[in-house]
From Swiss-Prot:
<dbReference type="GO" id="GO:0005739">
    <property type="term" value="C:mitochondrion"/>
</dbReference>
<keyword id="KW-0012">Acyltransferase</keyword>
<dbReference type="GO" id="GO:0016874">
    <property type="term" value="F:ligase activity"/>
</dbReference>
<dbReference type="InterPro" id="IPR045864">
    <property type="entry name" value="aa-tRNA-synth_II/BPL/LPL"/>
</dbReference>
<dbReference type="InterPro" id="IPR000544">
    <property type="entry name" value="Octanoyltransferase"/>
</dbReference>
<dbReference type="InterPro" id="IPR020605">
    <property type="entry name" value="Octanoyltransferase_CS"/>
</dbReference>
<comment type="pathway">
    <text>Protein modification; protein lipoylation via endogenous pathway; protein N(6)-(lipoyl)lysine from octanoyl-[acyl-carrier-protein]: step 1/2.</text>
</comment>
<keyword id="KW-0809">Transit peptide</keyword>
<feature type="active site" description="Acyl-thioester intermediate">
    <location>
        <position position="272"/>
    </location>
</feature>
<feature type="binding site">
    <location>
        <begin position="241"/>
        <end position="243"/>
    </location>
    <ligand>
        <name>substrate</name>
    </ligand>
</feature>
<feature type="domain" description="BPL/LPL catalytic">
    <location>
        <begin position="108"/>
        <end position="312"/>
    </location>
</feature>
<protein>
    <recommendedName>
        <fullName>Octanoyltransferase, mitochondrial</fullName>
        <ecNumber>2.3.1.181</ecNumber>
    </recommendedName>
</protein>
<dbReference type="GO" id="GO:0033819">
    <property type="term" value="F:lipoyl(octanoyl) transferase activity"/>
</dbReference>
<feature type="binding site">
    <location>
        <begin position="162"/>
        <end position="169"/>
    </location>
    <ligand>
        <name>substrate</name>
    </ligand>
</feature>
<comment type="similarity">
    <text>Belongs to the LipB family.</text>
</comment>
<dbReference type="Pfam" id="PF21948">
    <property type="entry name" value="LplA-B_cat"/>
</dbReference>
<dbReference type="InterPro" id="IPR004143">
    <property type="entry name" value="BPL_LPL_catalytic"/>
</dbReference>
């Protein structure tokens, strides 16, 4: 079942981060803006039931593949038109019907999409450790079950194509995947997308309501450091991990925010390659708050929409993960 809700609403990392942050500081509303009509509406697919990590990865890859397939078709058309122009020395013509079809194909560009999930316990390995992870290390992750998590499935280890090293996804954590074409936004390289994700997370931790019955915000004082991610307690504890992947300007992966996660899943191991670093959660920082992964998901997507300069947000709440299965 699903429900649809419509709302209005650099090559050098350090240089890019400063430039993007400066934009954010001087104009709180946005860090970029759409330059293509397709990017003017953002679609939020909000999965409301906990699912296996691989299922979420499969959904993400299906949507990314659709974006890439459209790019492939458009590139082939462009190459063919150039070839015809060269062969006929600028005299080649196409009839009106062919032109209408080609114009429609060339105008096809998917909207930006944000997927939000809560996953079963999973450790994921980024590209940095793809060739160095040993069977013994994987076994250690997959055999770890906190005393309070006996009713949850045993953790799995999954290799993924995002940047970074090992991180954890599981109950009490909202995982947010951002699928968009960087070229449909003004001056928006991948490193600036990372900065945008971090700032959206910081604003989420500050502005999300303590509970449904009050307008009082969490007002968590979060920040960025020299290490990617979002931190609290003056940079001593990490509350959100960030990692993206880009193929032909199409992005995937994004951010994981710890809401009421069992922190022993992360603090019993070295996460993200950061030694002597502790992970925290919203509930550890604000034990009197009544928030859940879904309220944080909605809050983050609103903040990200503003920072992207997008005016229209459409949300589809999905409680049946099989709704996106391909027809046989």
């Amino acid at each position: 079942m699903s429900r649809c809700i419509r709302q209005s609403v650099c090559t050098n990392f350090n240089v890019c981060r400063r430039q993007c942050f400066s934009t954010y500081a001087s104009a709180l509303k946005e860090m970029t803006h759409p330059i293509k009509p397709s990017a003017q509406t953002l679609r939020h697919l909000q999965f409301t039931q906990r699912i296996p990590f691989q299922k979420g990865l499969e959904i993400q890859e299906t949507l990314v593949r659709a974006n890439l397939d459209i790019k492939d078709i458009q590139s082939k058309i462009e190459r063919k038109l150039i070839q015809l122009d060269e062969e006929y020395k600028g005299t080649a013509t196409i009839n009106d019907n062919e032109k209408r079809i080609l114009d429609k194909v060339m105008a096809m560009k998917p909207n930006p999409i944000i997927l939000t999930f809560e996953f079963e316990p999973t450790y994921t390995g980024g590209k940095r450790i793809k060739k160095t992870m040993t069977p013994d290390q994987i076994a250690a992750y997959e055999s770890f079950i906190p005393e309070t998590q006996k009713d949850n499935p045993r953790p799995k280890f999954v290799q993924v194509e995002r940047g970074g090293q090992v991180t954890f996804h599981g109950p009490g954590q909202i995982v947010i995947y951002i699928i968009l074409d960087l070229k449909t936004f003004q001056s928006f390289p991948a490193k600036c997308l990372v900065s945008c994700i971090e700032q959206a997370t910081i604003r989420t931790l500050k502005n999300t309501k303590m509970c449904d019955d009050t307008d009082k915000p969490l007002n968590l004082d979060a920040m960025t450091t020299k290490d990617t991610g979002v931190w609290v307690e003056n940079g001593k504890k990490k509350v959100a991990s960030v990692g993206i992947h880009v193929r032909r300007s199409i992005t995937s992966h994004g951010v994981a925010i710890n809401v009421n996660t069992d922190l022993s899943y992360m603090n019993s191991f070295e996460m993200c390659g950061l030694k002597n670093t502790l992970t925290t959660s919203i509930m550890e920082q604000r034990p009197d708050a009544v928030v859940n992964v879904q309220s944080v998901a909605i809050s983050f997507v609103k903040e990200m929409t503003k920072l992207l300069g997008i005016k229209t947000l459409e949300r589809m709440q999905i409680d049946d993960v099989n709704i996106l299965k391909k027809n046989p």
